[in-house]
């Protein structure tokens, strides 16, 4: 394993890592930042759908992460910098001490992703979930419960936003995903692929615990607050989570976990 020393935060070789927070907002043209040891392990694993372009590590972390760094392919440069230089490159104190610049997978259509799935599959479908933490949690929950893909509409946040990747614990990097041009188009594609679309809503009269696992199912979730539009719920099977008096909804992280458990559990 060979590292390349960086002593100048303006070194052009690490330009992709510079001013991270500003580029979070402006975009990286097909690239993303993977932050921290756990996420980098996923990026470098065989399960990853993405590949690293370069790695940047604090010099005081090299010995502790040597095993991980040795799994980086020889053609991928590993840059090393002192903590003060690393912080100046990133534009803020970088406590995790390791970053990777990765390449997003080639974008696929929702139809193409669905065409690859088996006859029995559960997918997560999301509409108007713009919060980066929530997008990350959806991917994490989808991976944890064995869902086959995460599908979104055009009003959802980018799963390759740095914080979404971190919150997902790297699940974004290995979970198939795609975005539809609208919620209506997303439901159209699911129906055409013979998925039963199940929407979660506080207004539903059918309880979620009546759902049985099996077949092709899509768990459709909307934003916290407004939820799903009536036009979408009219096209779906709508179920709710029974709650104690005074409460009618949960956040999307908990709701998605409960829904996925219900759809993926197997009876003994």
Regions found by a protein language model. Give the residues of each.
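Amphipathic alpha-helical repeat scaffolds
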Residues: 36, 130-137, 250-255
């Amino acid at each position: 394993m060979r590292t390349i020393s960086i002593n100048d935060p303006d070194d052009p070789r690490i330009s992709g890592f510079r001013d991270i927070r500003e580029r979070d907002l402006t975009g990286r043209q097909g690239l993303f930042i993977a932050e921290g040891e756990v996420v980098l392990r996923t990026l470098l694993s065989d399960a990853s759908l993405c590949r690293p372009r370069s790695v940047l590590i604090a010099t005081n972390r090299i010995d502790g992460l040597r095993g991980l760094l040795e799994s980086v392919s020889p053609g991928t440069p590993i840059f090393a910098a002192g903590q003060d230089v690393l912080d100046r490159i990133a534009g803020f104190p970088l406590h995790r001490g390791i970053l990777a610049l990765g390449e997003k997978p080639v974008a696929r259509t929702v139809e193409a992703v669905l065409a690859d799935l088996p006859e029995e599959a559960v997918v997560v479908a999301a509409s108007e979930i713009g919060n980066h933490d929530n997008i990350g949690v959806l991917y994490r929950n989808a991976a944890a419960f064995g869902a086959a893909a995460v599908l979104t509409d055009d009003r959802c946040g980018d799963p390759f936003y740095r914080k979404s990747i971190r919150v997902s614990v790297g699940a974004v990097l290995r979970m198939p995903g795609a975005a539809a041009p609208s919620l209506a188009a997303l439901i159209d594609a699911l129906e055409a692929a013979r998925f039963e679309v199940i929407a979660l809503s506080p207004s539903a009269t059918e309880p979620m615990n009546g759902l049985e696992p099996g077949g092709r199912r899509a768990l459709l979730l909307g934003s916290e607050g407004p939820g799903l539009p009536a036009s979408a719920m009219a096209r779906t099977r709508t179920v709710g989570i029974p709650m104690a008096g005074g409460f009618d909804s949960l956040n999307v992280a908990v709701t998605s976990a409960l829904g996925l458990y219900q759809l993926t559990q197997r009876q003994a």
